[in-house]
UniProtKB/Swiss-Prot annotation:
Taxonomic source organism: Conus ventricosus
Gene Ontology cellular component list: extracellular region
Free-text note on domains in this protein's UniProt record: The cysteine framework is III (CC-C-C-CC).
Cysteines paired by S-S bonds: 55-69, 56-65, 61-68
Subcellular location: Secreted
Name of the protein: Conotoxin VnMLKM-04
InterPro entries xref list: Conotoxin
Family: Belongs to the conotoxin M superfamily.
Signal peptide: 1-24
Pfam family, one: Conotoxin
Length: 69
């Protein structure tokens, strides 16, 4: 009877926990697949957007932009 309890514990508890862990990984896989299917132009725009900063003239700069001109 003890062996039957151990087998039931393994299948009902541990197997359930293992499948729940796999479910948690699916959103990341979907996000990676969505990025892979995106056109190269859109991917480039996403990658360059954080690096883009507003340029301003040095005499008008208030710290909210870079003096890159």
């Amino acid at each position: 009877m003890l062996k039957m309890g151990v087998v039931l514990f393994i299948f009902l508890v541990l197997f359930t926990l293992a499948t729940l862990q796999l479910d948690a990984d699916q959103p990341v896989e979907r996000y990676a697949e969505n990025k892979r299917l995106m056109s190269p132009y859109k991917r480039r725009a996403i990658l360059h957007a954080p690096r883009e900063q507003e340029c301003c003239e040095p005499q008008w700069c208030d710290g909210g932009c870079d003096a890159c001109c």
